[in-house]
Amino acid sequence: MTRDVVACERCPRLRAWCREVAEVKVRRFQDQEYWGRPVPGWGDPAARLLIVGLAPAAHGGNRTGRIFTGDRSGDFLFAALHRAGFANQPTSVARGDGLRLLDCYVAAAARCAPPANRPLPEEIGRCREYLAREWRLLRRVRAVLALGKVSQDAFVALLRGMGRVPPRKAFAFGHGVRHDLGEGLHLFASFHPSQQNTFTGKLTAAGMDTVLADVNRHLGRRGRPATRRTS
């Protein structure tokens, strides 16, 4: 499946943007070779936690070839995953940096870096097949953490397409909101760890720790007090 993701050309707008960014670069990364292709998900194949992000960053995953790697969002996320016991180290700098995910797998709603960090709905729809294939492979998942409303909507759309949730059931989004999807599967929500959210204090390290503590409690791992719950 990784080969299929990397070779994907379904979204001309996204492919053109990723290639342009990889060629032009930014000054601080002028000496680096950019990945410039779709970015596959990665992590523990026996994971019970699936994290769904939005898309690779233009100078993060699109540069390094690994989602949430080499950018400020990844710095924030993996530090939190390390504190919660889902990663063996707090940093994600580049492929081959020694980072391992423990009981956790990271995917995205869109696999190419989008202009202005905003993939179009139809582009997310074209990427859904890859998330569906990962979902079928990750047979032990009992917790899904959606980073942002768009990511949550993408995952819910996947479940609707599979007949896993009722067609008209509404899923409220909010930081710390939790939905029971039945059969032991719970959907957790967090604000996306973008600089816009972390630099303004909308999402804090303590706030992310609280959500991950709730995930840990659900999975029977060591955790902190639960977040608020809906559904």
Predicted segments, located by residue:
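A polyanion-binding, active-site-adjacent surface
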Residues: 1-171, 175-177, 181-221
